[in-house]
Amino acid sequence: MASIDSLQFHSLCNLQSSIGRAKLQNPSSLVIFRRRPVNLNWVQFETKGSFVCKAIGDSSTPDEDIQNTQSDDNVVVVTATTQSDIPHDSEYSISRFRSMVTTLPPVVFLMKKCSVNSIWIGVCITATVLVAAIRAYVVRKSRDNQRAGSVADLVRRGQLRSGDRRGISKSLNYEDPFNNPFVKLDKGSSTVEMCGKVYRLAPVTLTEKEQTIHQKRRSRAYQWKRPTIFLKEGDSIPPDVDPDTVRWIPANHPFATTVSDIDQDLAQNNVYQKQGVPFRIRAEHEAMQKKLEALQNEEKLNNLSIDSQNARDFQRPYKFSAKLEGENIQKNSQENHTGNSSSEETHKS
């Protein structure tokens, strides 16, 4: 066991109660030094002693002082009967006090009581709290800097493909927006309930012109779903065809001239043609050939029908006899007659 000396000042009444002698006359002021045990490993003391220094002389006799020392083994009373003994006692008490002060342990040795494990535990807790605070600050700062509706925000919410998926044709699986259990629509009162909150829709009133513009704009959004129909100029629009999907082509266009010549069933059957000239191109070519042949026949027939008056203008004046002239006239009349009969037959056919 180690001990630390402590300085205690006792009054007269406390000293009398501790000694237990009623007849003992103590001085007015005493200085008592006692040793108090403290758990220190580096110094060990087994004795517990105390001594009393009398600061002022007293009228008590030396015999009484000797009796007091015999009654209490642990208390040593030093008395000075004359003024010549006071300096010696004071020097002895001061030296004893200095020796006790030198035995006090420094602060460094008291700090060794803290174990190394507790220090490391404290360091780990402090580092954890610091890292959590830094992470929370960084997350909050990044959310503030990231604008709502940016590309990164849309990718994070799944509304836009990321840069590495833009070339992939496979679509992502999204939830059905028209069958969302968290969104409830009420068509009667025009209210929408989303996430537990009810929103009332404001009424929208559009003029007829605005309604037609809106319908056309919405119809263009689904233009890819409706096929484009080609009609010849002057034809009537079928009842089940949207006028916005009709494209007018001129009457002299090859597509317009071959519409009646191409059979729809044949066109459907020849969709997967792999060999030879495509069916549509061949049909268009054949139709154009027929029309050209018909035009050429009409021109030939028109050239064959020549009037007699116009033919006389192209004839040269010959100086022959009357017989030759009569023969030529008969031949011309016969040729004209055969030409007219052939033209009538072609018209009838």
UniProtKB/Swiss-Prot annotation:
It comes from the Eukaryota. Residues 315-349 are annotated as: Disordered. Its main location: plastid. Residues 329-343 have a biased composition (Polar residues). The chain crosses the membrane at residues 117-139. Residues 140-349 are stromal. One of its GO terms (cellular component) is chloroplast stroma. GO terms for biological process: chloroplast fission. Disruption phenotype: Heterogeneous population of chloroplasts with variable size and multiple division sites. Abnormal subplastidial localization of the key plastid division proteins FTSZ1 forming multiple rings. Normal shape and number of etioplasts in cotyledons. The double mutant mcd1 arc6 exhibits similar chloroplast defect than the single mutant arc6, including the abnormal localization of FTSZ1 to short filaments and dots within chloroplasts. It is a single-pass membrane protein. The keyword Aminoacyl-tRNA synthetase does not apply. It is found in: Plastid, Chloroplast inner membrane. Residues 53-116 are chloroplast intermembrane. Keywords: Chloroplast, Membrane, Plastid, Plastid inner membrane, Transit peptide, Transmembrane, Transmembrane helix. The keyword Chloroplast applies. Interacts with MIND1. Interacts with ARC6 in the chloroplast stroma and binds to FtsZ2-1 in an ARC6-dependent manner. Required for chloroplast division. Together with MIND1 and ARC3, regulates FtsZ ring positioning in chloroplasts in an ARC6-dependent manner. Determines the site of chloroplast division in concert with MIND1. Not directly involved in ring formation, but required for MIND1 and MINE1 localization to regulate FtsZ ring formation during plastidial constriction. This is Protein MULTIPLE CHLOROPLAST DIVISION SITE 1.
